[in-house]
Amino acid sequence: VPSFKRDFDKLFNPKSIAIVGASNLPGKWGFMMSMNVVGGGYRGKIFMINPREKNILGFPCYPSIKEIDDEIDLLVVAIPASKVLGIIEEAVEKGIKNAVVVSSNFAEVGEEGAKLERRLSEVATAGGLSVVGPNTMGIYSASTDLCCMGAPVYPLKGNVGFISQSGNLGIQLMAWGQRRGIGFSRFVGSGNAANTDIVDFLQYLGEDPITKTIILYIEGLKDGRRFLDAACHITPHKPIIALKAGKGSQGQGAVLSHTGSLAGEFKLFQGMMEQTGIIEAETTEELVDLAAAFSSLPVPSGNRVGVMTLGGGWGVAAADAFDREGLEMAKLPQAVIEELDKTLPSFWSRRNPVDIVGNVNRANHFKVLDALASADDVDIVISMGTLLGRNFWVENMLKTTIRPLINMIRFHTLRLPRFELSILKGFREALSRSKERNPEGSGGINPNEALQWRDSVFVSHLRDLMRKEKKPIITVAVNEGERSASSLMRDSALFTAATPERAVRAAGKLATYSRFLSNHSNKARSSNI
């Protein structure tokens, strides 16, 4: 437990930053940190510290922090390890309360480095200076556009707070998150955690008003009891999702060589997660999925799922995963069946999953979703195969029309007139049938119906439906899996899974958190009796 009061508000919302080791040379850590702070849009005061330079990136240079008359809220250190202690001593003398030490070669490299790190911690702690690192990739804060990181990643702004014991992995996951449309409020790579650890930042994010969901990448804990107490305080009002590294003996060895920390017994940590309501992510991919789901979807009231599919196979793939994830296929009430009888063909299955049997009328898709989401017996809705992905029809029409035409010209030139006539005849017949279905119309394709197939219309309907029913609706896109899911999430701020299994997995984790909240609420009520 720290012997001094942390001032993380100034860490994440600094009015001034001094960068020791700032450089004009691309490839140096001092250059990358300086470039990202400036390029990220930070608008506070920036002081570049380098006795060998007159200016860096257009900013005047100072030989040391002693030469700066202004108050410094955040010190960034990117110099060799042997020189860091002297800078920390100067920072304490100046009254600086927060430092990000990017420099490596401390406890992660052996006993000599560990001794230097212990001395750094002693000096900083005695002076009331909170050190992020050493051996960190830095921090990010949406509220001040602060991209104080060692890689050119500029996250989307949002409500996800991220604490990672691997800065490299953390920044990579934020880059993936950016492509998926996930917005971040804060990020901190804790590094070797000389005198601040994951619990300090967890406590801060638990009270942080702009952070609604917390995700963690954890390699080891210095104080399990303190972590447990912090998590117990946070999870009843904010979800925490954790990926624990070092599950096996080989992983534990890798953790020790990475940050110099002990990974600990994984089963013990799993028990801690169950006790505190922390949601476990088993892979980096799942951590990103769950960050997207929890930050964009309401928490369900139970585990009963209504499924709408464009074809039967989608429903089977999803149902296979239900038992693994603790989900229940909702039983459709008679009122819902009768409502769907008005919309779907007479041969539909009249059960969940609701297979819309290739129905291409977009209005009918909306009616099925509305019926499922409004049913009291349904807590979560999964829609599969009805969200197409940006430009799906245009791209595929071009692919399926132009390529055969080219091949026809190349290999069957003499048959080309007959080929063209066949296509024209087919179009004429389609228009004729459309006229029969809609005798009062123009005889062509209904423009309003065509417009409803735009993803933006579908997504807008989902968003309104979720607001109305306060239930999560998860979609699985047809087109190109991960790429399509990423673009749709980025454009719509909704959770779109790349596969049925990942959709069900996310639904299961939402239901698990719902069950925890329900149990916690019951315990709280019991304690007040």
Question: PLM ranges: what are they?
Answer:
Residues V1-I529:
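Catalytic-core regions of core metabolic enzymes
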